[in-house]
């Protein structure tokens, strides 16, 4: 593998560490709050139970929105300059993708009946931030984060003169990103269900293949 490819993979790995490092803290707080609200240990409706429910509700926002956290974290980490702009563009791009994908599923007649994430579990679609979208999970955040960072690094220094001056730099990056994100939202409606089926099939093979499954997992992990 070329050194350039190795450097790119190392940069991506480091970018992943930002959001990942917050997860143990969120998980620990969620575990503590679950114990505090366990009716086998405390009285339901009491102060401790109420506090546990309150903490659990707040911390669950971290666990339940990993996609957007990875999107912002990866884009900010991979940006070579003006990282705050990259983070903001990542957030906007994520919201645009959600809205565009939800609308495309609707107009294309691909929306599966269900009003909650639990009702849509296993269908390949979910409810994310109020939008009925293709369920890409954390992969959406990873992919969008990388795309935003690449476009940001390529066009962040673009400037114009005269009346167009206000549309340079991060604003021009958004202009470039918008059609890319819209196309990605449409393509995901058709491509991701197939990719997800492949991932599930591979998981099933590794789980049922015994020693070979362990070898395959180790091999892919090393690759």
Show where each model-derived region lies.
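Transmembrane alpha-helical segments of polytopic membrane transport and secretion proteins
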Residues: 1-3
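Short alpha-helical linear motifs
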Residues: 111-117, 186-188, 201-202
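Hydrophobic alpha-helical membrane-associated segments
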Residues: 152, 179-191
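Alpha-helical transmembrane segments and their membrane-interface exit regions
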Residues: 145-150, 172, 200-207
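Aromatic-rich transmembrane-lumenal/periplasmic boundary elements in polytopic membrane proteins
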Residues: 185, 192-223
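Generic recognition of stable, solvent-exposed alpha-helical segments in well-folded globular domains
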Residues: 11, 23, 27, 69, ...
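Early transmembrane hairpin of solute transport permeases
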Residues: 5-168
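Small-residue-rich segments of transmembrane alpha-helices in multi-pass membrane proteins
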Residues: 96, 171-180
């Amino acid at each position: 593998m070329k050194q350039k490819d190795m450097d790119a993979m190392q940069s991506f790995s480091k970018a992943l560490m930002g959001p990942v490092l917050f997860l143990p803290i969120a998980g620990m707080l969620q575990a503590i709050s679950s114990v505090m609200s366990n009716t086998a240990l405390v009285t339901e409706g009491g102060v401790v139970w109420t506090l546990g429910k309150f903490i659990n509700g707040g911390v669950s926002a971290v666990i339940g929105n990993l996609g957007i956290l990875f999107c912002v974290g990866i884009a900010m980490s991979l940006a070579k300059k003006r990282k705050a702009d990259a983070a903001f563009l990542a957030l906007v791009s994520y919201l645009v993708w959600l809205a565009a994908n939800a609308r495309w599923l609707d107009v294309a007649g691909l929306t599966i009946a269900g009003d909650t994430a639990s009702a849509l579990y296993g269908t390949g679609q979910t409810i994310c931030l109020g939008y009925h979208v293709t369920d890409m999970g954390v992969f959406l955040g990873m992919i969008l984060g990388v795309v935003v960072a690449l476009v940001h690094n390529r066009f962040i220094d673009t400037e114009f003169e005269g009346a167009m001056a206000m549309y340079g730099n991060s604003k021009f990056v958004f202009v470039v990103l918008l059609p890319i994100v819209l196309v990605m939202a449409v393509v995901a409606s058709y491509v991701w269900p197939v990719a997800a089926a492949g991932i599930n099939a591979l998981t099933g093979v590794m789980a049922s293949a015994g020693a070979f499954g362990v070898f395959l997992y180790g091999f892919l992990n090393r690759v």
